[in-house]
Amino acid sequence: MRLPVIQGVIRRRILANFRVDAQAMQREIPARFRPKLQNGLAIAGVCLIRLEHIRPRAMPKIVGLNSENAAHRVAVIWDEGGESCEGVFISRRDTSSQINHLLGGRVFPGEHHRASFSVMESDSEISLKMNSDDANVRVEIAGRIASDLPSTSVFSSLAEASSFFEGGSLGYSVTNDPDRLDGLKLQTRQWQVEPLEITNVYSSYFCDETRFPKGTIEFDHALIMRNIQHEWHSADDLYV
């Protein structure tokens, strides 16, 4: 799917990340992909992002759209043209925007499900809840800005985690065609993340023991980005 370059502001982006048994994660992604591993574990999670002033690059800010969005994703690698590629596989997108819901998968990449979002935030704290209109997905997260990752994280430092996720700028989302994924690449003017000290985290998808049996998944850490100028560039579809 091709679309013009889209630009705007990432007002707030939370990456809530889980460490997952690699075999359990492989069962949840298309066979063409392999989990990208960190110390032998797959890394998956929810991207919770507030986008503002989203519009084609040639258009003024005043026409831009604002929305809250959630994407369930996993870091993956795959082979193409004899080379190893990396990105994220996005199994589901949810949005507060009716426009995103109607046009996603048709005019721009990725099907988007309608959802309601409740957000309370300050400079140092945030609490966010998301419930999909189809009642299939629920996400909660609450926390405050921290100085470092939890000591239990699979990443040895904030810099290591930042580099891992910066490499996942190319995302492939499910469509109504089970053999085709829509591609979209994020380009940021700067890449800067801060750790969050989490007091509550829940994802109905990642807490589903029919998908991830007990002992195969644990919450690892969360990161936040704020006030980032960015662009979205379409990428070639990927057939699985």
List each model region and its residues.
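N-terminal domain-onset segments
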Residues: 1-56, 191-207, 218, 224, ...
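N-terminal short leaders/motifs
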Residues: 19-34, 69-87
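Long, hydrophobic/aromatic-enriched structural stretches that serve as scaffold segments
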Residues: 42, 49-80
